[in-house]
Amino acid sequence: TLDRSSAASDVYKRQVQGWFCIELCSKEVTVMNKEYLIYKLSDEVKNSCKIDKDAFTKFNVKRGLRNEDGSGVLVGLTNIGNVVGYERDENGKLKPTEGKLYYRGYELDDLVTPLLKEKRFGFEEVAFLLLSGQLPDKEELEAFKELLNDNMPLDHRTITHIIELEGSNIMNILARCVLEMYTFDPNPDDISRDNLMRQSVELIAKFPTIIAYAYNIYRHSVQGRSLHIRHPRENLSIAENFLYMMKHENYSELDARMLDLLLIIQAEHGGGNNSTFTVRVTSSTRTDTYSSIAAGIGSLKGPLHGGANIKVINMFHHLKEAIKDWTNVNELDIYLKRMLNKEAYDKTGLIYGIGHAVYTLSDPRAVELKRLAGELAKEKGREDEYNFLKLIEQEGIKCLQEHRGGSKPACANLDFYSGFIYEMIGLPQEIYTPIFAMARIVGWTAHRIEELNFEGRRIIRPAYKNILGELDYTPLGER
């Protein structure tokens, strides 16, 4: 067994070289096997990829496309979403403020509150708004719902493809199915507005079905459970149809309405979030819709973007075991400080679900989800857990600010309550991030349409400065 740790890399190198070294005419000839060659290439990267942190300051590099004060570098304009987390004072400095999120000029709370009061589903209405820029009237909304429902069933070839994949990662299956849709599209490369809108509606409609089928097949092939493939039903909302395809009729009306609201809250978040920006960057090249959306899925799959809610719910389960008294603030504070000092839990120094790149005093999505989580916890008999989660939020923010020296405010983000809601609805962790994609496909397609239709558009092409310098070439025989 070879030790491949970085600390023992020299030992590993000698082991491999020794095993594959032969004596020939008093001359050692090293035969590099493929495994060692991969190691050697990887080892060289340690130096070739090293860039001094001071160089970023020297050349005024906007790392992560962020300014020195933490605000995002302005790279584009949009009419779709607006993320507000701070204001600027008279000197241009950032001033923390309560967070707000706008969809096509409408504040998120103004869209969500009527749905709660009227106890109706609204994801389709919000999708219409984000795609078109206008709120639908009753007739338009009913026609749009029918259009989405008509497009939910999958081509039999796509179903066969999902069955053949039997993958353990639903996001990868989703991306591959999206790319496969290119093959079945009669006009896949057409970027006219009509065709873009048709493709967008079809993607929004098919994402729930792909995800539900992919999970059920994963559940069968990997977990050995019974295989159930349920076709979407007419006259059900997207949220209801998704739960039906996942769980048959084993869900409540409140479960479906909570999922519907979760989809609304995650549908859009401006043009600068990583996955939406990825879609806009790829769209600026005029590539096809399916390639662009698959790239967005790849971005969202990353644990720093779409996978954080799983980290929050796992941390929550750990804290439920680690803290004996869920009402003891002092006991919780001590443990959270140990986490920040990398002494407890996964020793990353993080309290998952606390902090955001833009929001300062509050994340409006987390505010809405906190309200929804409380309503659902009451129905499910999980109010003690909900109250403990609220206490973790309260003390986590306080401990993080103390740890930072009080210089920067922090708040709970979208991921803090979303995983708990998914769990109460009875949805497995394997589809937490895919559900995020099921919601965000609306924002992605809206931004793609906008990127390809505003005046003066250009391919997005930022600059990278090379700091290596020139080298003299050495002939192969002299190396």
Language-model features: locations:
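Single conserved hydrophobic/aromatic residue that forms the stacking wall/gate
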Residues: T1-Q15
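Non-transmembrane, aqueous-exposed alpha-helical and coiled segments at domain scale
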Residues: V31-R479
